[in-house]
Regions:
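Short, intrinsically disordered terminal tails adjacent to the first/last structured region
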Residues: 1-5
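A structural signal for multi-pass alpha-helical bundles of membrane permease subunits
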Residues: 8, 12-312
């Protein structure tokens, strides 16, 4: 008679728990170091006030706790300061403009480069140029052409001229066009690398089934690189309110037209222009932006998971 020894109760569960813990150690350590560690002092500043000589206190002059007063000030400013409403509007507008224009073109250009199409070489040179050269060099060239060269051409051809960066009505679209051009490099690099990892056997099988050039992109390439696409989209959502969209590079701290500022630029501007006594309120702004961004990122992740071609 053969007897089978029973495993000790809970052994498998313990092994599973240890395995899960090992998987979570690195991301949790990264979160603790690069978020909690880096922002620990900023979080503490929310509950303090400036007392002079770069010193802060948790107590008011009357001896009571500062508490949530900085958060209250931050919330009041968010709903009663025009710069905040303009910043939110522009940040969201730039994000959605990039989503409906830049994202599809990123994918298509990456696909042309991946398939080694004739136009792919030209696109690679033109769109990689801003990533290869210094950002300040490309900005100076772009600004000189748009603000100095283009008005001369328009005056010669149509008898009219304008300064794209000084005119508030055209500055926004001019900044967007620069971001549109300069933003291809990193995304194309990620997409082409992901496409290059697709197995040749999968591509050959699709060709044997008679798939067309663009049919291969829709039915094979895009579903296979969807994890990369999802990662880029979630990263973009997280950075909506932190991105200053090169406004500082074009205008510095004070010269940007009020109608084109973004949340990221306004926060950067206030951090550099306001005194140390304003740091607690700025820290409160940062916490609020985090509280807003995290649910947006989770919603984006959930929505992208639902439309994942590999899951359906």
């Amino acid at each position: 008679m053969v007897t089978v020894k029973k495993a000790k109760w809970g052994t498998e569960k313990v092994k599973q728990a240890i395995f899960c813990a090992c998987l979570l150690v690195l991301p949790l350590l990264q979160f603790c170091i690069f978020y909690i560690g880096v922002n620990f002092n900023s979080i503490l500043l929310i509950f303090q006030r400036f007392v002079g000589n770069n010193k802060f206190s948790f107590l008011t002059e009357s001896g009571t706790a500062v508490g949530l007063s900085n958060l209250k000030t931050a919330f009041y400013d968010l709903f009663h300061t025009r710069n905040w409403s303009v910043g939110f509007k522009n940040s969201l507008l730039l994000f959605f403009l990039g989503l409906v224009t830049h994202t599809p073109l990123n994918l298509i250009v990456s696909y042309f480069i991946y398939k080694k199409a004739r136009i792919g070489g030209v696109l690679k040179v033109v769109l990689y140029a801003p990533s290869i050269m210094s950002a300040m060099v490309t900005i100076v060239i772009y600004k000189f052409f748009v603000d100095e060269g283009l008005p001369v051409l328009l005056n010669k051809w149509f008898g009219t001229s304008y300064g794209a960066f000084t005119d508030g009505s055209t500055a926004f679209i001019t900044i967007f066009l620069y971001g549109f051009w300069s933003g291809f490099g990193s995304s194309i690099l990620l997409y082409t690398n992901a496409m290059g990892a697709i197995s040749d056997s999968i591509v050959e099988a699709a060709k044997l089934d008679g798939v067309s050039f663009f049919g291969e992109f829709i039915h094979v390439t895009f579903p296979m690189i969807f994890p990369t696409f999802k990662m880029i989209m979630i990263t973009n959502v997280v950075g909506i309110f932190g991105n200053q969209f090169t406004l500082f590079e074009f205008y510095g701290l004070t010269a940007a037209p009020p109608d084109i500022i973004t949340v990221g630029y306004y926060l950067f501007q206030q951090t550099n222009l306001m005194g140390s006594d304003y740091y607690p309120v700025l820290s409160a702004y940062g916490l609020i932006m985090t509280i807003v961004s995290v649910p947006l990122a989770l919603l984006a992740r959930r929505g992208l998971n639902k439309i994942d071609p590999m899951e359906s």
